[in-house]
UniProtKB/Swiss-Prot annotation:
GO terms for molecular function: acetylgalactosaminyl-O-glycosyl-glycoprotein beta-1,6-N-acetylglucosaminyltransferase activity; beta-1,3-galactosyl-O-glycosyl-glycoprotein beta-1,6-N-acetylglucosaminyltransferase activity; N-acetyllactosaminide beta-1,6-N-acetylglucosaminyltransferase activity. It comes from the Viruses. The lineage of its organism: Viruses, Duplodnaviria, Heunggongvirae, Peploviricota, Herviviricetes. One of its GO terms (cellular component) is host cell Golgi membrane. This is Beta-1,3-galactosyl-O-glycosyl-glycoprotein beta-1,6-N-acetylglucosaminyltransferase. Its EC number is 2.4.1.102, 2.4.1.148, 2.4.1.150. Was acquired from an ancestor of the African buffalo around 1.5 million years ago. GO terms for biological process: protein glycosylation. The gene is Bo17. Residues 1-12 are cytoplasmic.
Length: 440
């Protein structure tokens, strides 16, 4: 009997010990689960949960873009020459084999918008309160290469921003339908209400932006600045970095605006007419309205909301808009001239001390072939590592380190058919910096 009682006590002791262990494990598990609790659908990276490295890692892994090629993007963004050479050699091997995503692909995948946004890794919540409180507007003028458009949209997308997309009327129907399918998945992305056929170097390129300006001003989104883009652009700053840069402008605009050369003055000396292309006539134009001095720049701007409003509503601005309609490449002198007009919000004086080069403005980073050379001998930048079109560098992987050293918000031109590795690394760099706040 004594032996049986001893066995019962022993069993009861083991039972209590095991129960205690289970309870201890449960408490530890609960504490760990609370410690590592991460809601990846949280609206703010500054929330308490996301202060932990674990949660940041979870979010980054859920949004990390799949690498198409095994290249050393961290090395490339830091200017490591071995990594750059390997990427350039890899590009020579694969660029003719790579098939871009097609309109049909996007028409199919966007039938399920949530699947499309998840699979293509769109960031679907504001990454900080500062960004939430400073929405940016985009005018996106595109005409071809649907994958380029979708990747550009993904790179600049944030749910608090607003995006107007203008598609060239002449674009193939499949392209138009694919763009419509993509933007139908986002409440803050829309097609311009009026579309025009865009002819190179003609007024229609400006009209496309003006149409988006009108639509964006009617939006309920209280955007602060407007950036305009084309299909060969790509951001080189995160949305958070853009917000910081735009705040530092303090209501000023940023765009190239310089005294025109004699050859560029010919662009508005005679009237131009448009058929399928733009051609000059023998009809001389009257001087610019309101004795306004003309300046030249490029098609890209960083413009305050007040500037945009005055482009459309100010009578003096409208007179200049009408006057440049029959000039050559009016987008390269309309914005540059309005930026020096004293009645325009955020403008700067016409005095030579206020001339702004494309390298000084933050709107767009471009490598011009005729400026490339030996930096140690005074050239503004080294030769293009990609190819040239119309004397503009189509960037290669060897340009990325230089690109990232500059203060511009976007760069031009990129083409994955020329070098997809530079885009892959830029996408990886921006996504990493957006989540972690640090470079690769």
């Amino acid at each position: 009997m004594k032996m049986a009682g001893w066995k019962k006590k022993l069993c009861r002791g083991h039972h209590l010990w095991a129960l205690g262990c289970y309870m201890l494990l449960a408490v530890v598990s609960l504490r760990l689960s609370l410690r590592f609790k991460c809601d990846v659908d949280s609206l703010d990276l500054e929330s308490r949960d996301f202060q932990s490295q674990h949660c940041r890692d979870m979010l980054y892994n859920s949004l990390k873009l799949p690498a198409k090629r095994s290249i050393n993007c961290s090395g490339i963004t830091r200017g490591d020459q071995e990594a750059v050479v390997q990427a350039l050699l890899d590009n020579l091997e694969v660029k003719k084999k790579r098939s871009p995503l097609t309109g049909t692909y996007y028409l199919n995948i966007t039938r399920d918008c949530e699947r499309f946004k998840a699979q293509r890794k769109f960031i679907q919540f504001p990454l900080s309160k500062e960004e939430l409180d400073f929405p940016i507007a985009y005018s996106m003028v595109v005409h071809e290469k649907i994958e380029n458009f979708e990747r550009l949209l993904r790179a600049v997308y944030a749910p608090q921003n607003i995006y107007c997309v203008h598609v060239d009327v002449k674009s193939p129907e499949t392209f138009k339908e694919a763009v419509k399918a993509i933007i139908s998945c986002f409440p803050n992305v829309f097609m311009a209400s009026k579309l025009v056929p865009v002819v190179y170097a003609s007024w229609s390129r400006v009209q496309a932006d003006l149409n988006c300006m009108e639509d964006l001003l009617q939006s309920s989104v209280p955007w602060k600045y407007l950036l305009n883009t084309c299909g060969t652009d790509f951001p080189i700053k995160t949305n958070a970095e853009m917000v910081l840069a735009l705040k530092m402008l303090k209501g000023k605009n940023s765009m190239e605006s310089e005294v025109p050369s004699e050859s560029k003055k010919n662009r508005w000396k005679y009237r131009y007419e448009v058929t399928d292309t733009l051609y000059p006539t023998s009809k001389m134009k009257d001087p610019p309205p309101d004795n306004l001095p003309m300046f030249t720049g490029n098609a890209y701007f960083v413009a305050s909301r007040a500037f945009v409003q005055h482009v459309l509503d100010n009578p003096k601005s409208q007179r200049l808009v009408e006057w440049v309609k029959d000039t050559y490449s009016p987008d390269e002198h309309l914005w540059a001239t309005l930026q020096r007009a004293p009645w325009m919000p955020g403008s700067v004086p016409s005095h030579p001390k206020y001339h702004i080069s494309d390298m000084t403005a933050i709107a767009r980073l471009v490598k011009w072939q005729y400026h490339e050379g030996d930096v140690s001998m005074g050239a503004p930048y080294a030769p293009c590592s990609g190819i040239h079109r119309r004397a503009i560098c189509i960037y290669g992987a060897g340009d990325l380190y230089w690109i990232l050293q500059n203060h511009h918000l976007l760069a031009n031109k990129f083409d994955p058919r020329v070098d997809d590795n530079v885009l892959q690394c830029l996408e990886e760099y921006l996504r990493h910096k957006a989540i972690y706040g640090t470079e690769l």
